Amino acid sequence: MWMQLNTRLMIALCFIAGVNAFSQKKIKQLDKVEVDILYNYYEQDGNNGAVTGGLGTEKLDNNAPQISVSIPVNKTATFGATLGLDHYTSASTANIDKYGAVTSASTRSETPENNDNNLASEDTRKYLSLNFSRLMPDNNSAVSVLYGYSKEFDVTSNYGKITWQKDSKDGNKFLSITAGVFIDKWLLIYPGEIRDGRNTGAGGGKNGHHHDDDDDDDDDDDDDDHDYYYDYFNTDKDKDDDKDDDDDDHDHDHHDRLVTTNYSARDDDDDDDDDDDDDYYGNQTAAAFKGYDKDTRFTYNVGATYGGNINSRLNASVTAEVIIQKGILNTPFHRVYFNDGITQEQFKHVKSEKLPKSRVKKALGFRANYFVSNFLVTRLFYRWYTDDFGIKASSFEIETPIKLGDGFTLYPFYRFHTQTKSDYFEAYGAHNLDAEYYTSDYDLAKFTTNKYGVGMKFSPVNGVLGFKINKKREFQFKSLEFRLSRFKRSTGLEATSITLKNTFTF
C-alpha cells in the first residue's frame, strides 16, 4: 500500500527520492548529539483511482511521526538512526475486493456498497534506517553508508546506499558519488474478481491469480518516490523537498510526507508477511494472506553531483542519475478495464495491470542559490527526466527564504511539473483487447502539477532555549519549523500537507 501512498500521497516523489541524489546533502561532522522530531499530516482526493481502473476515489489520509538521531562517535565519525511510522487510511485500496473476494478476512455482498472490507483500507508502514559517516581530513574526503528497512502488510523492503564525497582544498567545490539498491518483496494480491477467475478473459494463474510472469511488473513509480527519507522542509537547499519529480510520475506531496536522513523510500517489504500480518490485522486476516504468491523488485541507482561556490553570492550544483529497475514493476491490485463494448462494469473485461519487467530512468538536475541581500535568498531548481516507458518530464521550483528578524525565516515556494504519458497508459475502458502491456494508473498519464506553500523557521543563533545538563553538556532547543503546502494536478488530484519539525542538541 505504500505504493498507493507514495503515488497518491506522497505527493514524494518521495520523496525514488532514489532520485534523491538530486537533493544530496554534503557529509558533515557534528560535535553534539542532534535529534530531529517530525510529524507530517497528508491528505488527498481525486477521481482516478488505479485500484478501480482509473475511475474512482483516490481519497487518502496519512499521519507520519518520525524521529532521527545523529551521534558523534569521535572527531571524524557520526552514527545516525531514523525510526518512523506512516499510518494511512485509503478509500481507494478498500476497493481491492470491490466485486467479490475469496479471502477469509471479509464477507462480500452482491452490492459493492454493502461490502465492509478493510483488507487494505488502513495500514501502518514501519521503517528504520541506520547510517554511519566518516570524514577523512587528510585528503578532504568523506564516506557514508546507510541501511534501511520498512514493512507494511503487502510489501517488505531493504535498502542500502553508499556515498563518497571529495572537497577541493579550499572547500569551495565538491564532488559526490552515490550508489544504492532497493529490494522490495511484494505479496501478489489481485482484485477479488480476478482471484475468483471472473471477467479476466485470460484464465488464471495459481489460485486463480492472473499471474503469468509478465504480469508482475510494475509501474514502479512508487518505488522511486520511495526514498528512504522525504525532506519536508527543504530549508537546506542542498536537498530537494519533493522527490516526486524524480519519478516524475509521482509529483504529489508524498514527498512532503516522509523524512529521514537522506532518502525517503517505498520501503515496504518482507517475506515473513505472515507473522507480521498477525500483528496488523489479527489471526483471521493474516491467514487470508498466507496463500498469496510473492515477487521481488530490484532497484539500482547511481548518481553524481558536482557543485560549489561560484562567487560570494552564488553557489550551484549539477546532478546526474541513472536508475535501473528489474522484477515486478506493476501493482497487482491495480485494475485495467478494456474497450470491449460492454457498459456495465461488473461484466467488462478486466485484468491486473501489466507492465514490462525492466525500466531505465535518467535524470539531470540543476540547483542554484543566490544571496540577493542579507535578508533575502533565491533558490532555483530545474530537473529533466526521461525513461523507457515513454515518459519525459520537466520540473521547476523556486523558493525565496526571507529573514524577518533574529532567527525567524519565512520561505514561500512554488513548484511546477509537466510530463508526457507512458506508452502503456490509457484511461478507463480505453485499452485495446490485444494490448501487450496496460495500465490506467494516472501517475503514468500526461499531466501538469502545481505545488505551492509556505514554511516558517525559528532558529535563533543561541537556540530557542537551553539549560545545563552537567558541566560538560548543555541541552539546546535549536529550531522549530512549520511547513504547509497545497498540490494540484491537472487530472483533478488535490492534496494538502502539513509538517512540524523541531531540532535539539545536547
Model feature map: region roles:
Residues 59-65, 122-128, 156-160, 296-302, ...:
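Residues that define the transmembrane beta-barrel architecture of outer-membrane proteins
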Residues 48-51, 56, 84-128, 171-217, ...:
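Outer-membrane beta-barrel translocator/channel fold
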Residues 67-71, 130-134, 162-166, 302-308, ...:
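Residues on the lipid-exposed face of transmembrane beta-strands in outer-membrane beta-barrel proteins
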Residues 105-116, 323, 329-358, 363-367, ...:
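Outer membrane beta-barrel transmembrane domains
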Residues 74-76, 137-139, 169-171, 309-313, ...:
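Outer-membrane beta-barrel channels and translocator barrels
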Residues 39-45, 85-89, 147-153, 166-168, ...:
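Transmembrane beta-strands of outer-membrane beta-barrel pores
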Residues 35-37, 81, 143-145, 175-179, ...:
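Membrane-embedded beta-strand positions of outer-membrane beta-barrel proteins
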Residues 41-64:
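Surface-exposed strand-loop-strand hairpins of Gram-negative outer-membrane beta-barrel proteins
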